[in-house]
Design a protein with these regions (language model features):
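Nucleotide-sugar donor-binding/catalytic module of glycosyltransferases
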Residues: 1-165
Length: 165
């Protein structure tokens, strides 16, 4: 099983889109942890409504403490052999989990990282795609943390939401 941790803070309508992209995954053995970080716009209520429709979704709530605290709370409650993150304004391609899992199993990697499309609105409100690196497997045979630190030093921009650990 893969645990997907999604921090939620005042996500509004974006939350539904993000959750639907997770539910459409070709690999269905996952749990989705929606961690509400003290939203004030009804996002927590929406998270609970979404959880009623699919038993793979669990909702955790905490007072507003920031995205890192929300991710850490999710880590404390995840049950999967693997875990990944998906932010509340992200969408996952339908084969994202399957692709990462196949790469991890076929290489024996400790961490796999996927490619991504980063879209930002320009001044005119039009989506602009920014450059992104391809996916890769990270095989660590060094003491815990040492190999990953070396990987981070050799890589470009780092995000937690395009990797599976």
């Amino acid at each position: 099983m893969i645990s997907i941790i999604m921090p939620v803070y005042n996500a509004g309508v974006l939350l539904h889109t993000a959750v639907e992209s997770v539910l459409r995954q070709s690999f269905a053995d996952f749990e989705l942890l929606l961690v509400d970080d003290g939203s004030t716009d009804g996002s927590a209520a929406l998270a609970h409504e979404l959880a009623k429709k699919d038993d793979r979704i669990r909702v955790l709530e905490q007072p507003n403490a920031g995205i890192c605290a929300a991710r850490n709370l999710g880590l404390q409650h995840c049950r999967g052999q693997w875990f990944t993150f998906c932010d509340d304004d992200d969408t996952m391609l339908p084969h994202a989990l399957e692709t990462l899992l196949v790469l991890a199993k076929s290489t024996g990697a400790d961490v796999v990282r996927g490619g991504y499309r980063l879209l930002r609105a320009n001044a005119a409100g039009t989506a602009v795609e920014l450059p992104h690196p391809p996916g890769q497997a990270i095989i660590i045979h060094k003491p815990a943390g040492q190999g990953y630190l070396q990987f981070l030093q050799q890589s470009g921009p780092q995000f937690v939401w395009n990797a599976m650990y």
